Curated annotation (Swiss-Prot):
<keyword id="KW-0547">Nucleotide-binding</keyword>
<dbReference type="InterPro" id="IPR050747">
    <property type="entry name" value="Mitochondrial_chaperone_BCS1"/>
</dbReference>
<feature type="modified residue" description="Phosphotyrosine">
    <location>
        <position position="181"/>
    </location>
</feature>
<dbReference type="GO" id="GO:0033617">
    <property type="term" value="P:mitochondrial cytochrome c oxidase assembly"/>
</dbReference>
<feature type="binding site">
    <location>
        <begin position="230"/>
        <end position="237"/>
    </location>
    <ligand>
        <name>ATP</name>
    </ligand>
</feature>
<comment type="function">
    <text>Chaperone necessary for the incorporation of Rieske iron-sulfur protein UQCRFS1 into the mitochondrial respiratory chain complex III. Plays an important role in the maintenance of mitochondrial tubular networks, respiratory chain assembly and formation of the LETM1 complex.</text>
</comment>
<dbReference type="Pfam" id="PF00004">
    <property type="entry name" value="AAA"/>
</dbReference>
<keyword id="KW-0597">Phosphoprotein</keyword>
<dbReference type="InterPro" id="IPR003959">
    <property type="entry name" value="ATPase_AAA_core"/>
</dbReference>
<keyword id="KW-0067">ATP-binding</keyword>
<dbReference type="GO" id="GO:0032981">
    <property type="term" value="P:mitochondrial respiratory chain complex I assembly"/>
</dbReference>
<dbReference type="Pfam" id="PF08740">
    <property type="entry name" value="BCS1_N"/>
</dbReference>
<dbReference type="Pfam" id="PF25426">
    <property type="entry name" value="AAA_lid_BCS1"/>
</dbReference>
<keyword id="KW-0999">Mitochondrion inner membrane</keyword>
<dbReference type="InterPro" id="IPR003593">
    <property type="entry name" value="AAA+_ATPase"/>
</dbReference>
<dbReference type="InterPro" id="IPR014851">
    <property type="entry name" value="BCS1_N"/>
</dbReference>
<keyword id="KW-0143">Chaperone</keyword>
Amino acid sequence: MPLSDFVLALKDNPYFGAGFGLVGVGTALALARKGAQLGLVAFRRHYMITLEVPARDRSYAWLLSWLTRHSTRTQHLSVETTYLQHESGRISTKFEFVPSPGNHFIWYQGKWIRVERSREMQMIDLQTGTPWESVTFTALGTDRKVFFNILEEARELALQQEEGKTVMYTAVGSEWRPFGYPRRRRPLNSVVLEQGVTERIVRDIREFIDNPKWYIDRGIPYRRGYLLYGPPGCGKSSFITALAGELQHSICLLSLTDSSLSDDRLNHLLSVAPQQSLVLLEDVDAAFLSRDLAAENPIKYQGLGRLTFSGLLNALDGVASTEARIVFMTTNHIDRLDPALIRPGRVDMKEYVGHCSRWQLTQMFQRFYPGQATSLAENFADRVLQATTQISPAQVQGYFMLYKNDPAGAIQNAESLRR
C-alpha cells in the first residue's frame, strides 16, 4: 500500500483520530501546567520577596511576639505557658497566644504579607527535644524595606517589654536562652550591705565599664572578676540582681554543678554570653574543692561532672578566654576554694557579705518603715544585737513581713529574732 493511502486510512479511522485528539489535549495540558509552574517560579523570583527566620535566630522570638500583635483575627493559635514561682512562694502562670504552624495573612504597611510558620517533625532540637521550626515571610514586590521595618518593629517591641526589667539567661546546650519573662528591676538601695561595700563595688565596676581603652592601651585583658563570700541569706545573689538592674545589664546564670557541663562547653558559653551581661557562677565551692582536700581523699571528692578545675581556670583567664566580660562568683565557704581560683586576674575584687551589723539593721528598719525617727531604728538594732549577733538580712526581712505596718511591734518583739 502506498504511503499516501496509509496516511489517508489513518486519517479516516475514527479511533485513531480520537486517540490523537486525547494525546494532543493531554500534551497541551501538560505544557500549560509546566508553563504555569515555570511562570510562577519566575514571578516569585522577580516579583516577590521572601524572608526565612530559623528558630535559632535571636529575632525568632521577637517576630512571634510581633505576629501576636498583628494577627489578632487568626483562628489557628498555639499557646505558650510561662510558670513562675516567686520568692514568697506564690505561683503564677501566664498564657500567650501565638499563630500556630501553618499559613497566615496579615496586612502591613499597605501590603498583604503571607506568613508561614513551619515545623519539621523529622528534625528535632537535641538540646530541648522540640521540633525544628522556622517562620517565612512572603510579600509582593522587590523592596526589602518592608522586612527591615518588620524586624525593627519587632525589636523595638521586645525592648519595650524589657524596659525597666532585668533579663535572665540560662545555658541550654551551647547557647544562652531567656529564662522566663524579664523581671522588674530591683532598686540597688533595696539590698542593704555593710556600709561602703555597695559603693566600692559600684565604683569599681563603673570604672571598668567606662574605660575599655585604658585596658587596651596597656595590653591588659579587658575583663573583671568579683567574688562575694559569706553566710547564706546575707544578700549576695540579691545584690547582684539589683546591681544588674542599676547597670541595665542582663544576668547569665551558669551552674558549675551541671553534669553536662564540660571544659569546651564552659569556654564556649563564656565567649558567646550576651553583651552587657553579668555572668553569675553561684556556690562555686559546691563545684570544686581545694586541691589539698582532694589530695587527702581523692575518692570522696571525685567530681561527678565533666568540668575540670583546670578547665574552669582556663575559661576565666586562659589564652582562649574572652574579653569585655564581667563574672561574679558567690560562695558560702571561701576557705574551701583553691587559691588558684581566687587569685588576681581571675578574681579582681573580693567582698565579704556577712551577718547584719548595727548600721545595716538601722538602715533596713528605716527602709521598711519610712518616716520613723532614727532613734527608733537604732533602738531596734540594739535590741536585735542584744538577742543575737548572728542574724542575716533574709531573717530580718522575714521578720519585718510579720509587722508590715507596726514598727512599734517590731521593736517590742525584736528579741524573738534569737530563735
